[in-house]
C-alpha cells in the first residue's frame, strides 16, 4: 500500500512542484511563488528527453532559479539541476516499469491531505503569500497536478524498494543508471541554452538579500529554521 507521508508544507509545495529544491523563507514566500510561477505557469516546452520522458524548459529554468535564490552560484545550480532531472526521470521510468501508477482517487486523497496540512501549518501565512506570488491557489494546483502525479508514482516506487535499500541509495543508483543512458554533453548544452535565455533574471536573483531559509530532506518530516 502507498505510504502517505506528512511532508512539511513548504517543502512539499516546492519539491512537488518538480523543481527538486527545498527552499522557503528567503526574501519572501511571495517572491518564491513568483519565481516558480514565472516558469511553470507557461505552456510546457519540451527541450530534451531522458529515456523517453520529456524534460521541459520550464522545469530546468525554475530549478536553476530557485537554487540561485537559495544562494547557490549559477554554475552549481545547473549541475545540481542536471543531476536532479536525470535522477527524477529515471525513477519515473522505473516506477512505470514496476506498475507504480497513481489513480485519480489517490491523487485527490493526497491533494486533500496536503491542502489540510498547509492550512494548519504554522507558516500558513507564508503559504498564502506563496500562492499569491504564484497567481492564486487554484492556479498552483492546476499547473502542478501533472508533476505531482509523476512525483507520487516515484514516491510509490521508492517506498516499495526501501526494505532493501535506503532512499539515498535508490536515488544514487537511479542517477548512475540514468547518466549512462544520457548524452550528458548534449543535455548540458540544452541546460546552458535555456538558462542563457534567463541570464539577466538569474543575475537579479544573485543580488538579492535572503537571510532566512527553511531546509528539509525527503526523509524528514519537520522543517528547521536557520539563519544565513
Predicted region positions:
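Short, low-structural-confidence N-terminal segments
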Residues: 1-77, 185-228
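N-terminal targeting/tethering segments
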Residues: 32-142
Amino acid at each position: 500500500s502507498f505510504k502517505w507521508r506528512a511532508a512539511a508544507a513548504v517543502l512539499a509545495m516546492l519539491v512537488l512542484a518538480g523543481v527538486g529544491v527545498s527552499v522557503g523563507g528567503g526574501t519572501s514566500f511571495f517572491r518564491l511563488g513568483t519565481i516558480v510561477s514565472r516558469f511553470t505557469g507557461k505552456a510546457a516546452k519540451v527541450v530534451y528527453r531522458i529515456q523517453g520522458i520529456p524534460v521541459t524548459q520550464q522545469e530546468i529554468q525554475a530549478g536553476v532559479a530557485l537554487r540561485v535564490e537559495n544562494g547557490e552560484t549559477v554554475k552549481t545550480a545547473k549541475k545540481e539541476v542536471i543531476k536532479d532531472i536525470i535522477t527524477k526521470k529515471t525513477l519515473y521510468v522505473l516506477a512505470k516499469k514496476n506498475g507504480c501508477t497513481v489513480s485519480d482517487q489517490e491523487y485527490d486523497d493526497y491533494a486533500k491531505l496536503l491542502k489540510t496540512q498547509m492550512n494548519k501549518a504554522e507558516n500558513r501565512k507564508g503559504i498564502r503569500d506563496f500562492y499569491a506570488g504564484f497567481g492564486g491557489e487554484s492556479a498552483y494546483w492546476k499547473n502542478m497536478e501533472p508533476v505531482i502525479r509523476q512525483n507520487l508514482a516515484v514516491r510509490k516506487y521508492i517506498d516499495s524498494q526501501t526494505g532493501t535499500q535506503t532512499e539515498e541509495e535508490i536515488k544514487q543508483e537511479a542517477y548512475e543508471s540514468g547518466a549512462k543512458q544520457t548524452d550528458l554533453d548534449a543535455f548540458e548544452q540544452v541546460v546552458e541554452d535555456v538558462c542563457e535565455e534567463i541570464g539577466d533574471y538569474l543575475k537579479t536573483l544573485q543580488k538579492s538579500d535572503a537571510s532566512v531559509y527553511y531546509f528539509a530532506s525527503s526523509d524528514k518530516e519537520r522543517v528547521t529554521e536557520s539563519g544565513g
